[in-house]
Structure formats: C-alpha cells, structure tokens
Design a protein with these regions (language model features):
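Phosphate-binding site recognition
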Residues: 1-167
C-alpha cells in the first residue's frame, strides 16, 4: 500500500487560509507529509525552496529579498526552521501593498520556528499542524490497518504489516 494518500481536508484548509493570510505555516513531526502537501501549492518548480539543500539555504541566506521578492504566486519554503533569519524577510514581503506572492512555509516544530512565527509573523500567518492520518483520510475500509499500524504515514503506507513495524 505504499501509495500517497490525498489529504483533501488539509489541502482545502491550506487553500482557504491562503485566501485570508499572506503566509501559511504547515507544521508537524517528521514524515507526516508536510513537504508533500506544501509542494502541491507552489506556482511552479522555481517557486519551491528546500532549506535542507545547502546551496538553496546559502542563496536565501545571502539575498532573500532579491530571490523571493521577484516571485509572484505561491512560494513554498520547506524546512524553514533551518534559516530563522528568513522570518523578518517574510514579514516584509507579506506586508507589501500589492502582495504579489503568498508563502507556504513548512517545517518541524522547533523553538526557532515558534519564535520566528511569534515574533516576526504575528498577524500575517495561519498555522496548521499536521499529524498522522485520520479515519477519513485512510478510508473507513482501512480502519483495521489504521488501528494495527497506527496513524504515522510511513507505518500506515508500508507494503506489509511486518514492514510497518519500527517505521
């Protein structure tokens, strides 16, 4: 069953929040699908930034305004907790009068992330926490698998019950 489940309700919540806020933060534990769902909102491949990539992080660290400020549409920044000094730049970009870009930022809940959101992005960001699958996402027909394997996506989506152990 190693397919990706669509998280329709979560996608709808992100889309709705993008209509009302310039920034949507998608937070959660490792491997719950933050990156996968956030990337679906990027206007194009050039609007996706993964801050675990050292070259990307270095470029955004040196000149975030020139890189992000020129973009229009929805920009996705993954693992944003890796570059906390980006939060003030996001605040400036979110406050632009014409607001040509909206941002979906994702990352693991960390002190840097919480501090950055609380100090720099207050009033500009909607925060959504992602957890494991729920019954509506897994499907009622899979209730036993959800009960046996748990809600953590890698475990639930493993090919076999034995493969799901320890994931």
């Amino acid at each position: 069953m190693s397919e990706i489940l669509k998280r329709q309700r979560l996608s709808e919540r992100i889309a709705d929040n993008l209509r009302h806020y310039p920034i949507v933060a998608v937070l959660g534990a490792r491997q719950v699908g933050k990156t996968h769902i956030a990337r679906t909102f990027a206007t194009s491949e050039s609007h996706r930034f993964d801050l675990e990539d050292t070259a990307t992080a270095a470029a955004l660290s040196e000149n975030p305004n020139s890189i992000l400020g020129a973009l229009k549409g929805v920009v996705v920044i993954d693992e944003v907790q890796e570059l906390p000094k980006l939060f003030p730049t996001l605040r400036v970009l979110a406050d632009r009068e014409d607001a040509p870009a909206k941002f979906v930022i994702s990352g693991s809940v960390s002190p840097n992330m919480i501090r950055g959101i609380g100090e720099s992005l207050a009033g500009r960001v909607a925060t959504l926490e992602i957890g494991g699958f729920d019954l509506t996402e897994a499907g009622v027909k899979n209730w036993q698998q959800l009960w046996l394997r748990g809600t953590h996506p890698p475990s639930f989506l493993a090919d076999t019950d034995s493969d799901s152990i320890g994931r």
